Amino acid sequence: MSVAADMEVMARKAKEASRAMAAASGAAKDAFLAGLAGLLETRREGVLAANAADLEKARAAGMDAPRLDRLTLTPAVMDGMAKACREIIALPDPVGAIESMRPRPNGLLVGCMRVPLGVICMIYESRPNVTIDAAILCLKAGNAVILKGGSEALASNLALAGLLREALEASGLPADAAQLVPTADRAAVAALCKLDELIDVMIPRGGEGLIRAVVSQATMPVLKHYKGVCHAYIDSGADEARAETIVVNAKAQRPGVCNALECLLVHVDAAPTFLPRIGDALRRVGVTMRACPRSLPLLGEGAVAAMPEDFGHEFHDLILAVKVVDSLDEALTHIHRHGSGHTEVICTENHDRAMDFLRRADASMVGVNCSTRFNDGGELGLGAEIGISTSKLHSYGPMGLVELTSAKFVVLGQGQVRG
């Protein structure tokens, strides 16, 4: 069969399995997660051997060090996947929960019940642990999942998908609720994007090119985990010691993640004192600053002149764009032009300007006097997440179990008819 035909067969199996998953009990889903955690611990050697084969091919192909790091599985990473399974067991099952039940004047009770989305297709790059992390969230939320990982991790992903299917069967759930696309052929993604009658939603997670390709081809809704061009605005009169701590944490703690700071905006009144201070602090942790003409002479060593393309760029590195602005309005205009809808924060002691920023900054998380790094499911109290959506429909921000469900109206009556 052709790749397109193979993908249609896979999607039909997933659709059938999704009906069983929607009706599955919470106990069965938790038994699956417990069983999978055990398999990840007892069968790790086979997975690590498959990963070693992927790494050998990647090195031979000249893969760079950061991508090799993302591709690598270790015993600690395997332990982390098993731990994630057990943590999700502890999360409440959203499926079947009825919210906002209210009486109508005619005696009807009207509410909303959480229901699975159906079949989710997850397309991702490099990190083989996403195979487990994505699948267990989708499955706990009562969905079936089709997984399409990067070609560089195919052997690792096949080994992990085998454990997923084994654990599903052992708990009485359909193995076809978790299927991995077993080919590196790029035609598979194009084919999956056209199966809107069988696949309910696509979730691409990876580089900007991957996400744009899926969005342009998909005939079903796409939840975009888009790039994270995150800004921090330092207001006039801000607590500079606190702002320094926030900026260093947001940029340097984990510079390669999507909620890391990429651009620092500083009010012109704060610039003469704050920029030399933050320049020293960032230099100590190895950050290179790409600065506008007004900020460059104030930052000292470690700063270079910014190019226009540095603003709006996701560096994934110890690099930070810096710009002086004349007002909160100018800061927000810059954010609206260059931001990606991910995370924006303000450091200020002025309540009115803080509230203005919260209302007007367009992002999935907007913060006052805190690091951008808090836009994370665990940090926001949502539990594990499948990604951070920068789309306003159907979910905006971290996508946890609840965000992998939808709601249907339920109406309880006693014989009422419409007149």
Swiss-Prot record:
GO terms for molecular function: glutamate-5-semialdehyde dehydrogenase activity; NADP binding. Pathway: Amino-acid biosynthesis; L-proline biosynthesis; L-glutamate 5-semialdehyde from L-glutamate: step 2/2. Signal peptide: none annotated. Keywords: Amino-acid biosynthesis, Cytoplasm, NADP, Oxidoreductase, Proline biosynthesis. It is found in: Cytoplasm. Its EC number is 1.2.1.41. GO terms for biological process: L-proline biosynthetic process. It comes from the Bacteria. Pfam families: Aldedh (PF00171). CDD domains: ALDH_F18-19_ProA-GPR. One of its GO terms (cellular component) is cytoplasm. It catalyses: L-glutamate 5-semialdehyde + phosphate + NADP(+) = L-glutamyl 5-phosphate + NADPH + H(+). Catalyzes the NADPH-dependent reduction of L-glutamate 5-phosphate into L-glutamate 5-semialdehyde and phosphate. The product spontaneously undergoes cyclization to form 1-pyrroline-5-carboxylate. PANTHER family: DELTA-1-PYRROLINE-5-CARBOXYLATE SYNTHASE (PTHR11063:SF8), GLUTAMATE SEMIALDEHYDE DEHYDROGENASE (PTHR11063). Belongs to the gamma-glutamyl phosphate reductase family. This is Gamma-glutamyl phosphate reductase.
